[in-house]
Amino acid sequence: MPQIEIRPAVSPDIIELIRLDHSCKTNYVWQMDRNINEGQFQITFREIRLPRPIQVPYPRLAESLEDEWQLASGVLVATHEGKQIGYTRLTENEEIQMVIIKDIVVDFPLRRQGIGTALILAAQNWAIQRNNRKLMFEMPSKNFPAIKLAFKLGFEFSVYNDSYYPNKDIALFFSRFLK
């Protein structure tokens, strides 16, 4: 992993974060199957290998970060040699002592080098310092790299939300207890 620093975002960071490649490439997706019978409702997610890799667009407009970053409970930025290379946007629900990782982005050339892991661990530390009990990680069902990362870091599948994103993609939520 390159030498990185993770710190809270400041205003000049935002324009650079918007410019990062927010999309991902994948050979797999999680496919949802619904089975509704009398007295029974069953949802199943299956890992499906695609016939060829697809480029998955980010489910939100990257430009929305410009308006939303100050409304977020926290935005943590990863930098390398003074350049912004990734970020995570956090939403805190103090009532239930939970933090949701709403966005996690690492610029394409630096992916698969541990930066996403470092951002999630920094988000976990941020949540613990604020006395939260649970960390939840949100992602589209097509973002297979994020799904694998969630499992690798000990998150468990919690819930889904159909047509959650502006592009109508399914959101998956993985969570883990902090204390």
Predicted feature locations:
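Conserved catalytic-core motifs of GNAT/GCN5-like acyltransferases
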Residues: 138-139, 151-171
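Extreme N-terminal starter segment of soluble prokaryotic enzymes
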Residues: 2-5
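Conserved GNAT acetyl-CoA-binding A-motif
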Residues: 127-138
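Short alpha-helical
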Residues: 12-15, 96, 144-145
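Conserved beta-strand-loop-alpha-helix junction that forms the acyl-donor binding cleft
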Residues: 106, 111, 137-147, 164-167
